[in-house]
Amino acid sequence: MSSVLDITYKKPKGFEGSASASLLGANAYVGSSSGKFTQVTGFRYKTGRSLLKTTDTDAEYDPNFIDLQTYMTYQFAPKWEINFLGNLAINNYKFIPHTRETSFGTATNAKKFKVFMSGQERDKFETLFGALTLKHNLNENTELGLQASAFTSKEEEGYDIAGDYWLGDAAEEGGGEIENLSIARYNEHARNRLHSNIMNVGHYGIARMKNNTLK
């Protein structure tokens, strides 16, 4: 399976940076150059707590996402360069449900559905990626490189949630609940884990011929 993406990472010529923050998270970027060495590093933090609080379910939501990426280069000889690309991503999700209430039906036949819940869910997803490349420029039109990369992923999902259902007629104007139509209970449990490790070593070559590039 091939990709049409051709990503080129920038090399800063001096010190640069930026940062921003909001109710949904924050991000920062810094780049620098000191002759033979350059680096660009970015950091992002996101949270969806305020967005998820608008759902029908009364619960404690605490999802957060952290992403760190860096790209470093070092030219140790006129035609030789070594670079490193690294990425770390950590996603956490915590959910403690309390109640859920939904009304549906028509004006003359309105129903109310309630769920009283207990328990919690905790999920965690971590990925770590690193790639080291040794690059040699034979001339202006020819480039050779040796790459080694590693990827590891860790996914954990666990929850123990119980719910008591109640279905009844919605309250009439000026009155109380009329009738309980149905009562039920459910339990959900899960312990899912997935760990994976992938390593790769490869060699590449690039030849530029007028308006064409051969890889």
Language model regions located:
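Short loop/turn positions at the edges of beta-strands in beta-sheet-rich folds
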Residues: 11-13, 22, 76, 138
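Face-selective signature of the C-terminal outer-membrane beta-barrel domain
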Residues: 75, 79-90, 120-215
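N-terminal periplasmic accessory domains that precede
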Residues: 1-16, 28
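Well-ordered beta-strand positions enriched in small/hydrophobic/aromatic, beta-favoring residues
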Residues: 5, 17-19, 41, 146
